[in-house]
């Protein structure tokens, strides 16, 4: 591979990464704005974030986690 081709490829990769990083930043701001809007309407943002995290779990993992949490709460009388 010639130095020119390598340079062009590297520049393309860097350019793509920069563009995606900018998009990621824009999306993060949109998510933040949505959470702020939800909070202004009385929703609990912490609970919403917990729900989003739980939704990413496999159904079996979620069931295991729920069972363990219930066991610990019962054990501690919570």
From Swiss-Prot:
GO molecular function: DNA binding
NCBIfam families given in the database record: PRK13694.1
Listed HAMAP family: UPF0335
Family: Belongs to the UPF0335 family.
Annotated protein name in UniProt: UPF0335 protein RP113
Source organism (scientific name): Rickettsia prowazekii (strain Madrid E)
